[in-house]
């Protein structure tokens, strides 16, 4: 497994290009993979070539988040698939990036408890649209990773993958997001490991019921090793069951970045924990 991070945990000096600067910093930290976004720059082909060239020279594998709303129906769904496919194909033509993660759709407005069509119907819509997206980008060697994005439980994501039935539609497992849908993270990992090709490593401190001033169940973002996600056990599950554990990316990511958090320290703590406790899995 290859250790990396998402881009928002890396800070760069003011005036530095945010993507190029983060590639340099990731390499300086000894990481192997960096998750970035190119949604605002994918039409600038010269820029894509610069990004790809720097990443190759610094030996950083780049993975992107595609985004998209795959709950749409009819012509709206077809247009959304075409929009995302156009972006991914353009990026692939000018870079070595061949993996893009995506949620099913906007998690704040659509999830397993959202009123509306039955859950099974919603999941089938996502499967149909992602099947079309996978077909549209397969010729370029692109793999799509559907993430459990604070919306579905592991077995539900697995059902979507199985229904879509495309070899280049796999999973980006987020280890901490399981808590957001009241699921044990290791149960989620067991359900998704056979499809997982990328992973957001996340830790969350859980309080089953907090007192005043904020009553109720709490899930708080913390650096790796300071919460209740058993990421070492999850990595063992992935080692045993993932299709290609040696090439599986482990990207450190916060559940959210607390207002008073120092991103650099958050990442440093997470990297140090990973290199100690996940050493048997890292390549």
Predicted feature locations:
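Hydrophobic faces of well-ordered beta-strands that scaffold small-molecule active sites
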Residues: 2-8, 34-36, 62-66, 100-102, ...
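Active-site acidic/histidine proton-transfer and metal-coordination neighborhood
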Residues: 56-61, 74-170
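N-terminal pre-domain/capping segments
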Residues: 1-95, 268-283
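Residue-level preference for long, well-ordered alpha-helices that form the structural scaffold
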Residues: 15, 44, 77-81, 115-122, ...
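A short alpha-helix capping/helix-coil boundary motif
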Residues: 2-4, 29-32, 66-69, 110-114, ...
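Active-site beta-loop-alpha junctions enriched in small/polar residues
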Residues: 6-10, 37-41, 67-71, 105-107, ...
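Histidine-acidic metal/acid-base catalytic patches
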Residues: 1-11, 16-27, 154-168, 179-283
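Short glycine-rich, flexible loops that bind phosphorylated cofactors or substrates
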Residues: 43, 109, 208
């Amino acid at each position: 497994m290859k250790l990396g991070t998402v881009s928002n945990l890396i800070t760069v000096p003011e005036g530095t290009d945010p993507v190029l600067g983060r590639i340099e910093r990731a390499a300086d930290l000894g990481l192997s993979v960096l998750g970035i976004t190119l949604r605002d720059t994918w039409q600038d082909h010269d820029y894509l070539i610069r990004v790809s060239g720097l990443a190759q020279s610094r030996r950083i594998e780049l993975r992107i988040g595609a985004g998209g709303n795959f709950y749409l129906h009819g012509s709206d769904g077809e247009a959304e698939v075409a929009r995302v496919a156009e972006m991914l194909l353009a990026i692939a033509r000018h870079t070595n990036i061949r993996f893009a993660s995506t949620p099913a759709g906007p998690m704040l407005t659509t999830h397993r408890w959202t009123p509306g069509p039955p859950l099974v119907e919603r999941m089938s819509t996502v499967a149909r649209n992602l099947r079309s997206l996978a077909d549209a980008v397969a010729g370029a060697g692109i793999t799509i990773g559907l993430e459990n994005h604070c919306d579905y439980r592991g077995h539900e994501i697995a059902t979507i993958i199985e229904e879509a039935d495309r070899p280049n539609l796999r999973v980006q497992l987020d280890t901490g997001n399981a808590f957001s849908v009241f699921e044990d993270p290791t149960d989620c990992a067991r359900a998704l490991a056979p499809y997982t090709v990328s992973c957001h490593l996340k830790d969350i401190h859980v309080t089953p019921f907090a007192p005043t001033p904020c009553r109720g169940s709490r899930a708080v973002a913390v650096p790796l090793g300071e919460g209740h996600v058993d990421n070492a056990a999850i990595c063992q599950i992935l080692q045993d069951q993932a299709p290609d554990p040696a090439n599986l990316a482990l990207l450190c990511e916060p559940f959210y970045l607390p207002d008073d958090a120092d991103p650099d320290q958050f990442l440093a703590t997470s990297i140090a924990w990973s290199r100690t406790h996940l050493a048997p899995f890292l390549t």
